[in-house]
C-alpha cells in the first residue's frame, strides 16, 4: 500500500526554498514530503557579463544558505532559472510591454534556459549543480505574441513564456531537459537525493517482501 501518490518518500520533510508553483508540483508528483520556506531578500542580481549558468548557481546557493541558516539539521533545496539570449539574461517581465519585447527577441531564435539547484544537507554539506536546455522558437507573428501576452501567462515567467502552459505553441524544439525549462532539473535532483540517502523509493509491501 502506497502512503503517497508518488514513487519516492523521505523520513523528514524537505524544505523547498521556492515559491514557484511549478517546483511545488514536481515535488508533489514525485511524492516527496516537503514544506515551503521562502528566503528573505536572498536572490542576488546578475553581474554584468556573468554567464547564465554561473549566475543561477550563485543565486540558488544564496537562497539555500539563507533558509538553511535558520533551519539547522534540515535538508534544503533551492533553485533558480533564467532565460538567456546571446548570453544576456532575461528575467521576469516588468510589464506587458516588456513581455512582448522579450518575446519579439526570442521569436525565430534559439535561446538557453539555465537552472541552478543547491541542496544543503542535514549534516551541513552542500551540493550545487546546473542544467542547460536549448530552446528554439518559431518566428511567431506579432499578433500571436500580443494575444499570448494578453492571456497574462507571461507575467511571472522568466523570458515571458511558459512551456508547460499556453506558451507551448511558441516552441519549435528543445535540446535537453524539459523539466529544466519549467524550472527544476528533476532527473538530476532526484539522482542527487537518492545518492545522498535523502529520499528512498516507496515500494508496495509485496515488493519489499518478495
UniProtKB/Swiss-Prot annotation:
It comes from the Bacteria. One of its GO terms (biological process) is nucleotide metabolic process. Its EC number is 3.6.1.9. It catalyses: dTTP + H2O = dTMP + diphosphate + H(+); UTP + H2O = UMP + diphosphate + H(+). It is found in: Cytoplasm. Pfam families: Maf. GO terms for cellular component: cytoplasm. One of its GO terms (molecular function) is dTTP diphosphatase activity. The active site is at residue 80. InterPro entries: ITPase-like_fam, Maf-like. SUPFAM superfamilies: ITPase-like (SSF52972). It is an enzyme of class 3 (hydrolase). The keyword Membrane does not apply. Keywords: Cytoplasm, Hydrolase, Nucleotide metabolism. Its cofactor is a divalent metal cation. Belongs to the Maf family. YhdE subfamily. This is dTTP/UTP pyrophosphatase. It comes from Nitratidesulfovibrio vulgaris (strain ATCC 29579 / DSM 644 / CCUG 34227 / NCIMB 8303 / VKM B-1760 / Hildenborough) (Desulfovibrio vulgaris). The lineage of its organism: Bacteria, Pseudomonadati, Thermodesulfobacteriota, Desulfovibrionia, Desulfovibrionales.
Amino acid at each position: 500500500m502506497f502512503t503517497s501518490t508518488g514513487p519516492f518518500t523521505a523520513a523528514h520533510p524537505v524544505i523547498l526554498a521556492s515559491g514557484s508553483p511549478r517546483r511545488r508540483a514536481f515535488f508533489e508528483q514525485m511524492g516527496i514530503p516537503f514544506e515551503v520556506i521562502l528566503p528573505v531578500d536572498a536572490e542576488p542580481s546578475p553581474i554584468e557579463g556573468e554567464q547564465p549558468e554561473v549566475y543561477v548557481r550563485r543565486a540558488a546557493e544564496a537562497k539555500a544558505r539563507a533558509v538553511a541558516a535558520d533551519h539547522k539539521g534540515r535538508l534544503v533545496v533551492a533553485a533558480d532559472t533564467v532565460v538567456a539570449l546571446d548570453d544576456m539574461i532575461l528575467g521576469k517581465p516588468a510589464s506587458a510591454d516588456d513581455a512582448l519585447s522579450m518575446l519579439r527577441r526570442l521569436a525565430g531564435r534559439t535561446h538557453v534556459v539555465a537552472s541552478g539547484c543547491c541542496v544543503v544537507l542535514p549534516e551541513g554539506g552542500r551540493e550545487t549543480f546546473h542544467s542547460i536546455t536549448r530552446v528554439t522558437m518559431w518566428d511567431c507573428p506579432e499578433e500571436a505574441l500580443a494575444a499570448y501576452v494578453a492571456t497574462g501567462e507571461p507575467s511571472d515567467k522568466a523570458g515571458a513564456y511558459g512551456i508547460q502552459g499556453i506558451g507551448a505553441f511558441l516552441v519549435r524544439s528543445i535540446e535537453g531537459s524539459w523539466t529544466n525549462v519549467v524550472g527544476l532539473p528533476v532527473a538530476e535532483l532526484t539522482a542527487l537525493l537518492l545518492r545522498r540517502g535523502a529520499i528512498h523509493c516507496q515500494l508496495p509491501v509485496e515488493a519489499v517482501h518478495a
